[in-house]
Curated annotation (Swiss-Prot):
Protein name per its UniProtKB record: Probable histone-arginine methyltransferase 1.4
Protein family (similarity comment): Belongs to the class I-like SAM-binding methyltransferase superfamily. Protein arginine N-methyltransferase family.
One annotated GO molecular function: protein-arginine omega-N asymmetric methyltransferase activity
Active-site residues, Swiss-Prot/TrEMBL: 260, 269
Binding site for S-adenosyl-L-methionine: 161, 170, 194, 216, 246, 274
One cellular component term from this protein's GO annotations in UniProt: chloroplast
Subcellular location field: Nucleus; Cytoplasm
Keyword Cytoplasm listed: yes
Biological function: Methylates (mono- and asymmetric dimethylation) the guanidino nitrogens of arginyl residues in several proteins involved in DNA packaging, transcription regulation, and mRNA stability. Recruited to promoters upon gene activation, methylates histone H3 and activates transcription via chromatin remodeling.
InterPro entries assigned to the protein according to its UniProt record, in alphabetical order: Arg_MeTrfase, PRMT_dom, SAM-dependent_MTases_sf
Membrane-spanning parts: none
Encoding gene per record: PRMT14
N-acetylmethionine PTM positions: 1
């Protein structure tokens, strides 16, 4: 299929072209001509000085165009050919500057038309004209489309970016980790993986980065461009690229990767896989990763209030005469459903009944495939005699800078973050004595909805006389979906203690207060 516009060459005169990979070889003299052409059925974009034979060509099938401003774009290709030596390079990029917005628009229209035709040739056209690409990315292979759409829609909204920015523990720790390790950023090339609003990219630029590539797949990329453009002293060293890490190309290797890829239980949303893919694709040998290491912490807990609260949720389905209908056939399913939800909240660390243990995930060494299944053996020693209601989890990450090593934690008792903590509640608690050994397994299996299925087993080993013979006294298991948590952050936490309760930012209006407010409003309306 031949695009009519390429039956003859299309030429555009540019203000300037700067080669990112080799500034000394840039086409600096004016004018510079960009030409779309089709040579031996291969579509090319060629840059050449009008009075010289020097220039280079990009294969359009592997070329991407990124807008930096109204008159400025970055053109990146993973396969370019120099006219001088006819040798291909792995990746090359140029910054294009147009003379006016009319030329800019016409160039972009021609570029998109060529790319559209190339997609039709590589894929298959549906009846409604939609093109299905034959080159599905690795991200698309493992993540279902509906989940990805909702994920990118969520992070494409300023409301949710503001929620993360206002997590001052998170944002402040990142700022400190970067600024305290300026030597790792100064004069270096940085890639911000999942840049969001671009805040980490600007931190890197403030620390003296030579250039920052802010990669963001959601619509937030447009907001990031706007925010960065509003900080002109930083903007000249930051390029926002809209696309997935798995799909894009960069014109150079990175000295530093920076990202905020952590989800609930550290691994939720499966962004850590993208982080290590960026490491494998773009990070130079001996490059730095911020963060560097993550740890999942775990400890058994006792919380009778939480257990009763969850069990009571299913009591609705024990009604035998609900408007003449017997609901009890669904009671067991409802009970199982409530206990299949991990609980996300901030809890009192005094609920923990054994010293915690942790599982290390080294982002510099972990492979993408190792995130598909994470198996953690558990072993604790009970410090009190109690009923264990489940396993509490939280995480921390290390920024291993050359100057300062800084930890960021979501532990109970530490300043609360928007991640809170997470608890897996057993539908059948187990009884333990002080000093009794608790064993088990936490098994995480990744699924295509960008999350994990959690399989938890806890067992209490025999204690006292005869314990040396081994054996298990009690065992309880549960299966949970990390994608569907129970967000309990605003629920009142009642604990028997003589200490004054901690201050809360949540405001609870009781029903009596509501009735009084309604009466006052009615009286006010009557007086008007």
């Amino acid at each position: 299929m031949e695009i009519p516009s390429l039956n003859k060459q299309q030429e555009f005169t540019l203000a300037s072209v700067t080669d990112l990979t080799s500034p000394s070889s840039s086409l600096s003299s004016s004018p510079v001509v960009a030409t779309f052409s089709c040579v031996n059925e291969v579509k090319e974009l060629r840059f050449q000085e009008s009075k010289s034979s020097d220039g280079f060509s990009f294969d359009l099938s592997s070329t991407q165009l990124f807008k930096l401003g109204p008159l400025q774009f970055t053109c990146v290709s993973d396969g370019s050919i120099s006219s001088a030596k006819e040798k291909s390079s792995f990746s090359r990029g140029v910054v294009i500057k147009f003379r006016d917005e009319k030329d800019s628009k016409e160039f972009c229209d021609s570029f998109e038309e060529c790319k559209k035709d190339d997609a039709v040739k590589q894929g298959s056209a549906l009846p409604n004209g939609t093109v299905v690409s034959a080159n599905k990315s690795k991200f698309d292979d493992k993540i279902e489309a509906a989940s990805a759409k909702m994920y990118f829609h969520y992070y494409g909204q300023l409301l949710h970016q503001q929620n993360m920015l206002q997590d001052y523990v998170r944002t402040g720790t990142y700022h400190a980790a970067v600024m305290e390790n300026r030597s790792d950023f100064s004069g270096r090339v940085v890639v911000d993986v999942g840049a969001g609003s671009g805040i980490l990219s600007m931190f890197a630029a403030l620390a003296g980065a030579k250039h920052v590539y802010a990669v963001e797949a959601s619509e937030m990329a447009e907001y990031a461009r706007k925010l960065i453009a509003g900080n002109p002293l930083l903007a000249e060293r930051i390029t926002v690229i809209k696309g997935k890490i798995e799909d894009i190309e960069l014109p150079e290797k990175a000295d530093v990767l920076i990202s905020e890829p952590m989800g609930t239980l550290l691994v939720n949303e499966r962004m850590l896989e993208t982080y290590v893919i960026a490491r494998d694709r773009f990070l130079s040998p001996n490059g730095k990763m911020f963060p560097t290491v993550g740890r999942i912490h775990m400890a058994p807990f006792a919380d009778e209030f939480l257990f009763v609260e969850m069990a009571n949720k299913a009591l609705f389905w024990q009604q035998q005469n609900y408007y003449g209908v017997d609901l009890t056939p669904l009671y067991v399913s409802a009970h199982q459903g409530y206990f299949s939800q991990p609980v996300v909240d901030a809890f009192d660390p005094r609920l923990l009944v054994a010293p915690s243990m942790f599982h290390v995930i080294d982002f510099t060494m972990m492979t993408e495939e190792q995130f598909y299944e994470i198996d953690i053996p558990l072993k604790f020693t009970a410090s009190v005699c109690t009923r264990i209601h489940g396993l509490a989890c939280w995480f921390d990450v290390l920024f291993d800078g050359s100057t300062v090593q800084r930890w960021f934690t979501t532990a109970p008792g530490a300043p609360t973050t928007h991640w809170y903590q997470i608890r897996c509640v057993l539908s059948q608690p187990i009884h333990v004595m002080a000093g009794q050994e608790i064993t088990g397994r936490l098994h995480l299996i990744a699924h295509s909805a960008q999350s994990y299925t959690i399989n938890l087993t806890l067992s209490a080993k025999m204690w006292g006389p005869g314990a040396n013979q081994g054996g298990i006294l009690q065992t309880s298991s549960c299966k949970l979906d990390l994608k569907e948590p129970y967000y309990r952050m605003s629920q009142p936490q009642v604990y028997p203690t003589q200490e004054p309760p901690a201050q809360s930012q949540d405001i609870h209006i009781h029903s009596d207060d509501l009735e009084e407010l309604e009466l006052l409003q009615q009286n006010a309306n009557a007086q008007l």
